[in-house]
Amino acid sequence: MSQIESPNPEPVFQLKGSMLAITVMELARSNLEALDRQLAAKVAQAPNFFSNTPLILALDKLAPNEGPVDLPGLVRICRQHGLRTLAIRANRIEDIAAAIAVDLPVLPPSGARERVIDPIEAEAPKKLPEKPPEPLIKPTRVITSPVRGGQQIYAQGGDLVVVAPVSPGAELLADGNIHVYGPMRGRALAGIKGDTKARIFCQQLSAELISIAGQYKVSEDLRRDPLWGSPVQVSLSGDVLNIIRL
């Protein structure tokens, strides 16, 4: 006898946004033999760094006259050295076609500046201090005038209090909590250095984005919340943002 589903079944999944750091390998030449040798040398220096490391293969810096890339061979070499390819970044038609053929996602070229990673430095154990340093607590930053679109206000080492409206396009950042005593229509990012106990308080939730310690919700998600437009408190539990009425 088949089981009849209820008209309003419980959701079996959620789509969530998260800010993750992923290693990008930028290929300068399509010489797979040289790549194999150089990767082997890097692995010998820092084996723990190359252990199921997620990877984006960036082919967008290859010269237009550079020969075609053997993408399956490139992915295989990376896998042999502990790098797991998630997607490629490309702008040449032949590279995009090769990625589609092996069912790899294609990302657009990035205009952002990317930091060069030294695997040896990344793997080196950091010496722990004998006694944890006392946290440096800075005075709360208080803003009394309206925060307009395009403005960014950062409370380093402490809380941020805004006793005026925050317009769309404005951005509030704090290492601690954020309090907005007025309409919150911009972006609010609390605990930006990883403080999972940080909170966001606002008199009117109409934000473009709210974030605590890297976990965030955008306006499309927030508008579906029954507390949209109400006075709320936002906290983080695990990787879930909880919104409750003030």
Curated annotation (Swiss-Prot):
A Pfam family assignment: MinC_C
GO biological process terms held by the UniProt record: cell morphogenesis; division septum assembly; regulation of cell division; regulation of cell septum assembly
Keywords per UniProt: Cell cycle, Cell division, Septation
Gene3D superfamilies xrefs: 2.160.20.70, 3.30.70.260
Matching InterPro entries: CAP/MinC_C (IPR016098), MinC (IPR013033), MinC_C_sf (IPR036145), MinC_N (IPR007874), Septum_form_inhib_MinC_C (IPR005526)
Function per UniProt: Cell division inhibitor that blocks the formation of polar Z ring septums. Rapidly oscillates between the poles of the cell to destabilize FtsZ filaments that have formed before they mature into polar Z rings. Prevents FtsZ polymerization.
Subunit and interaction comment: Interacts with MinD and FtsZ.
Protein family (similarity comment): Belongs to the MinC family.
PANTHER family: SEPTUM SITE-DETERMINING PROTEIN MINC
Listed HAMAP family: MinC (MF_00267)
The protein's name in its UniProt record: Probable septum site-determining protein MinC
Organism of origin: Pseudomonas syringae pv. tomato (strain ATCC BAA-871 / DC3000)
